[in-house]
Amino acid sequence: MYSPHSNLLWENEDLTIVTPVNPHIPYKDGLHLVVAPKIDLSSAWQDTDFSSYAFKVAAKACSIMRTADIAPWFNIQANGNWGLLPGKKPFFHIHIYGRNKTDTWGKPIVLPMAPNTYNNKPMPEADQTKLKNLFKTELTT
């Protein structure tokens, strides 16, 4: 489900890849992308074939970004927890955190505890354009 609080980087008939307008981590620490299905899917185990496909697309996106020297490594995290927020219901989605070259490999993402407490600027337009072009030409599913 494509969020109006995100910028679309890539889509096909099944999935979208977006970058949040207010990402979970500052851009100096890395990038934040979200892979989300276009179907109503509350959890990965609700449709294991589809969720496996979504993880494959997320891994391929990471491979493309690594080859393009955008980030040397990534944290990939699956969520379906937004039903915890008022007015929201759970939906399956995958977060990709491209990590900064200066970070120690394996360093975990540290997120604030409360929702709506991220105060980070969006990915720069030039970098969004670069990813759009890379994904358009190289991310085939």
Model-assigned labels for residue ranges:
Residues M1-T141:
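HIT superfamily nucleotide-processing domains
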